[in-house]
């Protein structure tokens, strides 16, 4: 039986310079997956930096954007952070992603590295669960001009520096004033990001099918300042009204330094990310496994 995905790319997490043993391990993992994919009668492409850092230069290579233009499927080897970065860069191309977990928790990179072949074979032949996640589009407005913009799959976070005091943030939703918040910061999280930083700050978990966001204050000065669930059709504006050493980050990977009066606008992006999971995948099973929920009977 021929695979339905003919051109398959692999993007891997690789260690920094000097980590020899980790580099050898990364090479072995990527090479094993590459060989497996070619054995499935697929045309393999390695992401260029992955190939360079692992020394696997015998394979066809493309940069991430080239993968988006030319490949039918992308296998991401690493943790959720790796998947977030790849997902944002490929969102505009509609390339489906499969995560092979080489990290720790693995909410969206859900296929274990050990035994990945058993999970991956049916997916390559068209037997999978599709899971589409929305992205957020954010920009930093300064004196009426956008000075920084980024996509986020998990969250947009405005917070204070490590040695500064609380920040004061004016929050509006669709142009309607909500509150002035004094806190360590504020999180705007998607359903995907609701199990990340927002959860540790006391926010609720949103099912991926819910078209919403959650607005979560970080250590607020007023204890009645609680998380709010919003429609993702709204535009959230966060204005820096007070404080110093303030920044905005997007999926904890892109960072913008903020000034007094800056406004961060967050709206739903036109782009989405499509994850493919093994048949039988369940969001609730993922929560039980990753969060250690009790599974016993009465």
Swiss-Prot record:
EC number: 2.7.1.23
Cellular component terms (Gene Ontology): cytoplasm
GO BP field: NAD metabolic process; NADP biosynthetic process
InterPro entries from the UniProt entry: ATP-NAD_kinase_N, ATP-NAD_kinase_PpnK-typ_C, NAD/diacylglycerol_kinase_sf, NADK
Localisation per UniProt entry: Cytoplasm
Enzyme class, UniProt record, top EC level: transferase
Record bears the keyword NAD: yes
Annotated Pfam families: NAD_kinase, NAD_kinase_C
Molecular function per GO: ATP binding; metal ion binding; NAD binding; NAD+ kinase activity
Record: active site: 80 (proton acceptor)
Cofactor(s), names only, from the UniProt record: a divalent metal cation
This protein's UniProt keywords: ATP-binding, Cytoplasm, Kinase, NAD, NADP, Nucleotide-binding, Transferase
Family the UniProt entry places it in: Belongs to the NAD kinase family.
Protein name listed in UniProt: NAD kinase
